[in-house]
UniProtKB/Swiss-Prot annotation:
Family: Belongs to the prtT family.
Lineage, top ranks: Eukaryota, Fungi, Dikarya, Ascomycota, Pezizomycotina
Signal peptide: none
GO biological process, one term: regulation of protein catabolic process
Keyword DNA-binding: yes
Gene: prtT
Annotated source species: Aspergillus oryzae (strain ATCC 42149 / RIB 40)
Functional note: Transcription factor required for protein utilization and degradation. Regulates transcription of major secreted proteases including a serine alkaline protease (alp1) and a metalloprotease (NpI).
Record's keyword terms, sorted: DNA-binding, Metal-binding, Nucleus, Transcription, Transcription regulation, Zinc
CDD domains: fungal_TF_MHR, GAL4
Subcellular location: Nucleus
GO molecular function: DNA-binding transcription factor activity, RNA polymerase II-specific; transcription cis-regulatory region binding; zinc ion binding
UniProt name for this protein: Transcriptional activator of proteases prtT
Amino acid sequence: MTRTTVEPIKYEAPSWEHKSVHVSDDHRRIIPNVGDDATRPKGRIRRSMTACNTCRKLKTRCDLDPRGHACRRCLSLRIDCQLPETSERFQDSTPMWSDATTAIPSIEERLTSLERSMREMTGMLRQILNQSPSVSNISVPPLARSVHTEETASIEGNSFGPFLPKPVRLIQDLQSEFFGETNRIPVESPFLGNSFEKGILDSKLSLKLVQLFVDNFGPLVSINNQSDFHNEMRNTDSLLYSTACLLASRYVPGIPPPIVHTMNLQVRHKAVNLLWEKPPLKYESLQALALLCLWPAAGQKEFPIDGWLLSGTAINHALVSFDFLNHVPSELLIDNDIAAQLRLWNAFCLTQLHFAVGNARPFHLPQRYLDYCPRLLEHPAATVEDGKVVAEIQLYLITLRLQANEQRMRFAEVEYEEIERWKVEWAHLLGKVKQRGPSRINANYSTAGDENSTFELSLWFCQILLHRTAMRFQAESERLTSEILQGSRLIISKFLQLRFVTALRVVDQAYFIVGYAALNLCDFNFLDPLIDQIQMFLLHLSPNEDHIAYRFSCMIAEFKRRCAECNDPCSAVDGSQCSFGDARKMSMEQVQFVPPLVDSMIGGYSALEQLIPEVMPHSFPESVISGMAVTEAIPVGSAPY
């Protein structure tokens, strides 16, 4: 038999293996091109090379989750699963979500990632808002610069925010402890509703209250005479009318306290309803909100209005109503109507800053909207008071930025370069100046530098806050203590020079400044005679026991008593530090005010100077006057107001 030589068979890969193969979106199945089934040899199955070494040796199926790191057999045997390093394996092991082999990030890393994402989203939203269609065809470099730059006025909380002084919160907490304010506004009142609106205040009294409002409060909201009070504003349903009567009632102590209390409740309820209205709001509604922002603590029987929240909501309404969102400050033509709008806008910005500083809360208004504030001074009818408001806005912004700079606060400077530059820029409002030519200032308002101005109080107040913040890092600094004492004495001495009529119309922020200055004196030197003087001044000033001046007077007296007990080791009495004694029983009914009846005759409501009586010290409980070195009453008008 003939043996034939058999040539070795050369293996040739079938043509179907060279054709393109597509991987599905889930990276799990290999799908050939359409039409490959016709050319693919029968019986040949292309196996994936993803089995581990153990399964290949045992010739068993390797059940491997593409997202896993070991097959089921190796997991059950508790041995290392050695997977082949192939390109397919590499593709299968890169899913969209993090696989099991990736370490779980720490909480700090996740928070950092979230914060970074939030900052990116905020920047995108600001860019979208600033790319409004109405200004897309205009060159707006100021607008572009104000987005997320160092010049932005959005001041976040800082690392030592909880340690910042909170003068407004401190005073409100002391009042709550002393007077025990209710936690909510009563829903019903015996005079609240239509019966009150239809004539609890007779027409003659209403006219007098409106005139008092125009003379003392109106110019701050562009109401300079009664003709500016339109007929629709005089409706009893109007929040502006109710607010005007409430503010002016302090000049008429003859109005019974229940009526004043009901007026306060009515204003609160109307304000709540107004804030829920669909924007844009009417101009007179924004005027009323501006008044409530400037005097949020006018009535003190209930918990005070949160000026920070109210002014923030009012700012949002004003942005829509004044159409500031679709324009830049440089576009405005300052006519009379725009000037009136800017005056309200400045009031909203200033009160937001007041309570941001006073409560150590953030301020988030971008610089592009703050650029509207100084535009008011370009109007020919701008007053000195308008200039003071703009200057105060800049001052409080400087204070917020300095407080947010921990390094500057640790350095504990006595004089800050930013404050000094501000003083130079606004020196004409800080010192006495002579008017040249015809004055444009309302006769009822003070000129720069006279004894009725409270503008300097804000400067000393901001300096005290900066020194108090620095004392968090240098608690034993005698230099800072001396500066705080000096600033507090300047504030009280300046306020004591005010006439009663002027002191009653100052904004509530001035009372918080004076109260905080008195608390600082009690803290460092409770024997300072200015404490008793300001306490009695506020007591004489208050038209009723619900007024802010009366509450602050009682608070100062009680705080001084506590400080004296803390410094006197011989007067240690159990519970003395948390007891107010008989001070809560104080009532202004003990003072002989005018008869508490609403007289229908207009002559029954005389001027304030004729209605404030001489208050004798024995008219008040011992807990209030025990800490005061008062030997005789201070008659009204005897002090140099």
